[in-house]
Structures are given as C-alpha cells and as structure tokens.
C-alpha cells in the first residue's frame, strides 16, 4: 500500500501539470470547433424545423474538425512527448542503474515541472536548431539522450519513441472526431425527430460542446477534455516505461514487470486482476490482455520493472 501511495504521489507530481495544461488546450480546441461548426450549421437554419439528412450536416462538421485539427494534434503530441520523457526518466531511476542526464540532473525528480521537461527537450536541438518543442522533435536524431543506462541511450531518438510520438496526435484526433460525430448525430437526430427549431438544436449543440470542455463524465474526471488528457498522458508515460524495458531486453537483459494499482475504491476488477499475478516475464501479457497500463480510459495504474540476475 505504501508503494502504491508513494508511486501515485510521484506520478501525480509530474503528470498532473501536463494533464492540466493539456486539458485546458483541448477544452479550448473543443470550444473553437463548436463555434466553427455552428457558424456553418447556420446555413441550414431555413430547413428547421423539418427534415435534415445526415449528409447535409456531416460535411459541415467535418470542415469544422479539419479547421481545428492542428489544435488537437499539436496538443496531443506535446503532452505525449513530455509524458514519455518523464516515463523514461522514471524507469531509469527505478532500475537503480547508472545514468547521465541532460543539464546534470541525476534523478527524475529534478524534472518535476512541465517547464523543466520542456527545457530538457528544447535544449536538445542544439544552438543552431529550430526553436521550440517541435523544433526539438525535428532534430531528435541529434539530441543528447534523456538517460543512459548501461551504455544504452534513451530519449526521443529511440526508434520506438519516434514511432509513438509521430503517430499519437493523428491517432487521437481520429478517435476524437469519431466520438464527436456520434454525440452530434444524437443531438441533431433527436432535434429533428422532435421537431425542434434551428435555435433549439443550435443551443443543444452548444451545450454538448460545452460539456466536452467542462462536463463531468466520471467521478474523478472533470470533462471529456480532462478524460482525453489523463488517458493520453498516462498512455505516453507508460509507453516511456515500456520502451526502457524493451530496449534492455533487446540488449540481452532478462526483464520482469509488475502491474501496480492505486488500491482505492476507484480501482477496477480488471486492474486488480493484473496486479494479482505479481511479477511476470516482460514479454508475457497481463490477464487483461495488455502488455502494460493503461487497461482503460483514465486508468491510473503504473508499471514496475526489474532486471533478473
């Protein structure tokens, strides 16, 4: 129990600010998308109340989604990058193996701020490199490592990290867009079926987008924007953990892993079952079929690893 509480505190200390910043940015993106859609949806006002086919409004929504796509992609990419670096640092520190880190920081706790992580990433592009986080990503191949364990470099130049970061933004936007279409379809279909006016349907659409930004879908989740942030940051953090294990395994070390739950009333039976098997071989799936956390959206579980001598 102490281990879980300690890990949760440390995890929240570094991921909490990333999640909050990402939540705010995603909420703003939802608001802008809602405004962009309603601006186009107004062209259909003369048809309401009345029959409105999906093809008439879906194209307008897709245009609004395209207009705001970069807001979601850039936010997801930055949040995932910061969380992945934190995950790599956390695991390198966990394993208790020799490491060197940019800027002379010797433990992951030296980076317990979003600003610290951004400074780490931006500093890697070199004096002549492009500025900002995405400049650092563009120069990832030339970046010093985030950590070096037993002579093995870990950081954004790692092929597994590059692959994950390069696709996370687009993959997330695809899921967000699909879910948004389902929500808006329900709002419009219900409105048309009930003979609502344009103003009534537009108000319902506005309300739905507002809920995306500030609603409360779960007890410990404030909104859809928060749910997305918590899930994507957690996934990237866990992927950073896993990348260290994969690379050490490929280098010839025998690795084991363990699923760690937070152990409170919010812990689900699936995650409890994963923790119940204790330490397992690194390449073995947990009972849920996952190789690592997260088992579900908003999952708060952590991954422990150890080298077997």
Give the residues covered by each predicted segment.
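N-terminal leader/targeting and assembly helices and adjacent pre-domain segments
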Residues: 1-215, 307-309
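Acidic, glycine-rich two-metal-ion catalytic cores of nucleic acid-processing enzymes
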Residues: 218-309
């Amino acid at each position: 129990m102490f281990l879980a509480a300690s890990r949760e505190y440390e995890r929240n200390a570094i991921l909490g600010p990333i999640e909050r910043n990402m939540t705010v940015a995603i909420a703003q993106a939802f608001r802008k998308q809602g405004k962009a859609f309603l601006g186009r949806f107004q062209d259909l006002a003369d048809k309401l109340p009345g029959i409105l086919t999906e093809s008439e409004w879906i194209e307008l929504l897709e245009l609004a989604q395209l207009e705001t796509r970069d807001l979601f992609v850039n936010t997801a990419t930055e949040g995932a990058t910061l969380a992945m670096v934190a995950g790599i640092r956390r695991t390198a520190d966990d394993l208790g193996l020799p490491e060197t880190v940019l800027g002379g920081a010797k433990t992951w706790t030296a980076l317990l701020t979003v600003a610290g992580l951004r400074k780490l990433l931006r500093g890697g592009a070199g004096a002549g490199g492009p500025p900002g986080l995405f400049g650092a990503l563009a120069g990832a191949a030339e970046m010093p490592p985030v950590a070096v364990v037993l002579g093995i470099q870990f950081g954004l130049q790692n092929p597994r990290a590059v692959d994950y970061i390069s696709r996370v933004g687009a993959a997330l936007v695809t899921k967000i867009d699909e879910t948004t279409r389902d929500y808006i379809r329900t709002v419009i279909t219900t409105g048309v079926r009930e003979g609502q006016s344009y103003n009534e349907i537009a108000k319902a659409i506005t309300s739905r987008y507002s809920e995306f930004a500030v609603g409360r879908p779960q007890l410990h989740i404030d909104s859809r924007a928060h749910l997305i942030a918590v899930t994507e940051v957690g996934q990237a953090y866990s992927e950073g953990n896993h990348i260290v294990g994969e690379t050490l395994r490929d280098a010839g070390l025998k690795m084991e892993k363990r699923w760690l739950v937070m152990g409170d009333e919010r812990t689900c039976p699936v995650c409890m079952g994963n923790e119940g098997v204790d330490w397992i071989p690194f390449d073995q799936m947990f009972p849920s079929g996952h190789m690592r956390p997260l088992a579900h959206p908003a999952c708060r579980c952590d991954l422990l690893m150890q080298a077997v001598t």
